[in-house]
Amino acid sequence: MEYETNFRKKHICSNCGRSGHEFRNCIEPITSYGIINVCISDEYNESMIIKDKFCTKKNTYYRVSSRKHPEISCFISNHIRVRDHENMYKLDNEMIPYRSNEDIHKFCYYKNRILFMMVSRRFSLGFIEFIRGKYDVSDTKSIINLFQHMYEHEIKFINKNRYKYDNILYHFLNRNNEPKKIVLNRIYEGKYSNEYCEAKIKFNMLLNSSNEENNNIPVYLEFYIKHIKPKWKSPEWGFPKGRRDKRSEENMVCACREFEEETGYKKSDYSVLNKIEPIEEKLTGTNGVNYKHIYYLAINNCDINSDLTDYDTYEIGEIKWFTYDEAMARIRPYHIEKKRILTRVYLFILNYLIHNINNT
């Protein structure tokens, strides 16, 4: 249950959700919440059996406001289950115990029938950090790292517009095909105006190699564009996730909202397996910042062959379904934790299917 009041808003951290401090003083990693949506290509109602076992509620929530105190609103989520630790399941399977030839037969049957929904990001993290000016103009190594983590077409776009930073910024922040002037005015006069003004200054410093004031810059933009090649030929893939929309937003509510916003799914299109404990991924970004991603497991309820047209085309490049092997191949080698999470989810479901489904 969520409570939202003017008093509590001042004392709840929008990152970790705890009271007593605000985001700028939070010592926890920057935290996002997401959904790992799984589809089982079944013939024996396996998806329904798993939902009956590990899911207790629908993915809905309601807002209740007080007439006497309209500044107070209460969010009641009927998919949020009061934790009973004795009945919560953990993704702690590290192997599949084969008890008979029938188990091996089931393994061969199910191993490629478990599919994972994954999304690719429209913009690479390297491109995002560069456009936002998250670098030191004199730190050649860090800028090389950003360009190595860009997509090839992003570097070409920077080269094409290298004398017009505002064109690059407009391309990056134009969500709704608004006129360029409106978008740029909102950027340079809005909440993050200082950030993008500083980013533009840095960009122009890298560009203007003839300016005597830039003598402390060892390498200029032309060098990075011409000589630094991306490490990866294909986009990075992961699971839908995002950060809290407001301080009082519950973890699972945030995960569901972000999942629905990014994929275009409706609440009836998936079921959160809320009797399974969420799984955490911890990592340090290329910018040296610590991050934590908390994922809830869900079972898909809709046709995976239907075209998804309502997803967030600003943030998401593509949405696809992959087998375990295909998904592992699309996760970058340095994302060891993400591979571990995928493997634990896969083994948990595979174990349950092998030892609890009778399809002989």
From Swiss-Prot:
Belongs to the Nudix hydrolase family. DIPP subfamily. The active site is at E258. This is Putative mRNA-decapping protein. Might function as a decapping enzyme required for the removal of the 5'-end m7GpppN cap tethered to viral and host mRNAs to allow their decay in cells. In addition to the mRNA cap, probably also efficiently hydrolyzes diphosphoinositol polyphosphates. GO terms for biological process: AMP biosynthetic process; ATP biosynthetic process. Its cofactor is Mg(2+); Mn(2+). The keyword Magnesium applies. The lineage of its organism: Viruses, Varidnaviria, Bamfordvirae, Nucleocytoviricota, Megaviricetes. A zinc finger (CCHC-type) spans 11-28. Mg(2+) binds at E249, E262. It comes from the Viruses. GO terms for molecular function: bis(5'-nucleosyl)-tetraphosphatase (asymmetrical) activity; diphosphoinositol-polyphosphate diphosphatase activity; nucleic acid binding; zinc ion binding. Keywords: Hydrolase, Magnesium, Manganese, Metal-binding, Multifunctional enzyme, Zinc, Zinc-finger. Pfam families: NUDIX. A motif (Nudix box) lies at residues 242-264.
